[in-house]
């Protein structure tokens, strides 16, 4: 993401805390964020407290936010969208039923996890017990390698952007095997 866009998002959020990893810490420092910075590795090392977790679970309701995502913004200004638990649960119930996704499936994830399309892959896997196989982005430049990968991983379900399917089709990837 360009620094200007990230700064716009930070201005909109007015966040007091950001969770990051070592990989992005220097980028965050360049943006001039003045709030508290928590390192993901440190949070992962904290021992879980079952009592606190139970208290939080008891307070949660289905309309609580599950995630927030920023759109590209047709005006050039990013717009934040907050999606609640109930919205995702209802959608995934219908989606997995419609496409008959079960614990026997292997879902080939093409969409980045910071893009809302990945919700179908992530939560279909969580709901049904299906395996979610992350497909390395570089394979989309080599259709035969991509097809080999899908066959080797026994991928049964693809929820892809049309552009990804078009690339494979244009390069005759579906006729490969």
Model-derived features: positions:
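Active-site beta-alpha turn of Rossmann-fold NAD(P)-dependent dehydrogenases/reductases
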Residues: 63, 69-72, 105, 111, ...
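A short local structural element in Rossmann-fold oxidoreductases
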Residues: 29, 93, 169
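Short, well-ordered alpha-helical microsegments
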Residues: 3-6, 25-28, 118, 143, ...
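Conserved AMP-binding/adenylation subdomain of ANL enzymes
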Residues: 79-108, 116-157
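Carrier-protein-dependent adenylate-forming modules in NRPS/ANL systems
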Residues: 1-89, 97-100, 129
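Short, well-ordered alpha-helical scaffold segments within catalytic/effector domains
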Residues: 3, 53, 89-92, 143, ...
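Adenylate-forming
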Residues: 22-26, 111-114, 138-139, 153-177
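Active-site phosphate/pyrophosphate-handling residues
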Residues: 66, 120-123, 163
């Amino acid at each position: 993401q360009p620094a200007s866009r990230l700064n716009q998002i930070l201005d909109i959020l007015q966040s007091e805390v950001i969770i990051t990893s070592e990989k992005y810490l220097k980028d965050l420092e360049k943006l001039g964020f003045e709030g508290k910075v928590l390192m993901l590795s440190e949070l992962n090392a904290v021992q879980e407290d079952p009592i606190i977790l139970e208290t939080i679970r008891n307070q949660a309701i289905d309309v609580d936010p599950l995630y927030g995502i920023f759109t590209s913004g047709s005006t050039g200004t990013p717009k934040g969208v907050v999606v609640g638990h109930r919205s995702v649960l209802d959608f995934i119930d219908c989606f997995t039923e419609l496409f008959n996704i079960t614990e026997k499936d292997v879902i080939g994830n093409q969409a980045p996890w910071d893009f809302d399309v990945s919700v179908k892959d992530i939560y279909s896997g969580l709901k049904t017990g299906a395996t979610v196989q992350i497909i390395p982005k570089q394979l989309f430049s080599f259709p035969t390698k991509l097809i080999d990968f899908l066959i080797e991983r026994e991928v049964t379900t693809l929820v892809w952007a049309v552009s990804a399917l078009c690339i494979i089709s244009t390069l005759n990837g579906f006729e490969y095997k």
